[in-house]
Structure formats: structure tokens, C-alpha cells
Amino acid sequence: MKVTFITGNKHKLSEAEKIFHDTGIELEHADLGYPELQGTLEEVARYGAEHAARIMDGPVIVEDAGLFIRALKWFPGPYSAYVQDTIGNRGILKLMENVEDRYAEFRSAVGFCAPKSEPEVFLGVVKGRIGTEERGTRGFAFDPLFYPEGMDRSFGELSTIEKNRFSHRSRALKKFAQWYTENYEVI
């Protein structure tokens, strides 16, 4: 069965295509903007999926993700895209100067909705820490700052295949794929 991924982010699309490759889910793409509520990742994903399903008149997924840093009271959280666009990685590093507690989580919420149905949300989390400098040129956004638990390389130093083994987005998309293949006829 086809599902349309609503995103303007080519990196997210590439990650999703690789994850769905062997699932039987045919992923289509539409760069359709949708209003993002000022709320939790789950609320944004739920609303975005429902809104997009009505407009597209078909099953859709949306994804919202954020970097949550414990020492910064879980900032930037759901405001990660705005923070990335304004202060960027250098701004995060500046906020983290002389901070010992470097614990952070990347969280992802994948929202699914089909016309005339209630939206479903699937969560993925990966724990790690914020480095003291940017490392790596792969990935996007905060990837060069984030070191997954037990690794000495940042997300920015990992290939998409390596990152997809355990990233927050991969975990949320895999939960969705399992649910979707069990609840919808996959052709």
C-alpha cells in the first residue's frame, strides 16, 4: 500500500526510503507545508498528519523531531528547527560551554493518518550526549553535535545506513512500518 511522506527535508526522505525498502510499503513524497502547532512533538505530528491526510485525500505520514538537552531544561525540544535556523550548532555549543552534564536525547514522532480516520503517533528516542565541537559532515542539523550512547562518533560521522540502525527517526519509522503492515493490506 502506498503512503505519502509529507516533508520538505530531503535528508528525512532519504532515511525513510532506506528504512521502508524491504517492508512492502511504497513511499511517495509530497512537499506540502502544514501548520505546526506550538506543542509537543506528538501534538505536532498528530495535527500535521490529520491536516495532510485531508488535503492529500490519502494515507500520509509526517515526522517531527527534536534535540532535548537535559542541562538546558530539555531545550531546544520541539523548537529545534527554529533554533537550528537561528543560533545553529555554534549557538548550542555556546550555551553548553562549561556545562558538565552533556546528556541529550534525539526524539522523533511519526504521525500517520488516512482520510476519515484518527491519527496514530509512533515515538522513537535515542540517548546520547552533546560533544564539545562539531564533528562530521554527514547527516544534517544537530547531527555533528550528538554522540549516541556508547559511541565515540557523532551522528554527523555516521553513514545513513549506520545511523538508520538505531536513530530516533529510524525507531519511530520502524514502529510505524510494523503497525502499518499489521493493520493495512500491503500490496
UniProtKB/Swiss-Prot annotation:
For binding Mg(2+), which residues are annotated in this chain's numbering?
A: E36, D64
Q: Which free-text remark accompanies the cofactor? A: Binds 1 Mg(2+) ion per subunit.
> Catalytic residues?
D64 (proton acceptor)
Biological function: Pyrophosphatase that catalyzes the hydrolysis of nucleoside triphosphates to their monophosphate derivatives, with a high preference for the non-canonical purine nucleotides XTP (xanthosine triphosphate), dITP (deoxyinosine triphosphate) and ITP. Seems to function as a house-cleaning enzyme that removes non-canonical purine nucleotides from the nucleotide pool, thus preventing their incorporation into DNA/RNA and avoiding chromosomal lesions.
Q: Which transformation does this protein catalyse, written as a reaction?
A: XTP + H2O = XMP + diphosphate + H(+); dITP + H2O = dIMP + diphosphate + H(+); ITP + H2O = IMP + diphosphate + H(+)
Q: Which species is listed as the source?
A: Methanothermobacter marburgensis (strain ATCC BAA-927 / DSM 2133 / JCM 14651 / NBRC 100331 / OCM 82 / Marburg) (Methanobacterium thermoautotrophicum)
Q: Which family does it belong to?
A: Belongs to the HAM1 NTPase family.
Q: Which superkingdom, per the lineage?
A: Archaea
An example GO BP is:
nucleotide metabolic process
Q: What is its EC number?
A: 3.6.1.66
Supply the alphabetized keyword list.
Hydrolase, Magnesium, Metal-binding, Nucleotide metabolism, Nucleotide-binding
**Highest classification ranks of the organism:** Archaea, Methanobacteriati, Methanobacteriota, Methanomada group, Methanobacteria
What GO cellular component is one of the record's annotations? cytoplasm
The molecular function GO annotations come to: dITP diphosphatase activity; ITP diphosphatase activity; metal ion binding; nucleotide binding; ribonucleoside triphosphate phosphatase activity; XTP diphosphatase activity
Give the binding site residues for substrate.
T7, G8, N9, K10, H11, K12, A65, F140, A141, F142, D143, K163, H168, R169
Q: Which cofactor does it need?
A: Mg(2+)
Tell me the subunit arrangement: Homodimer.
What name does UniProt use for this protein? Answer: dITP/XTP pyrophosphatase
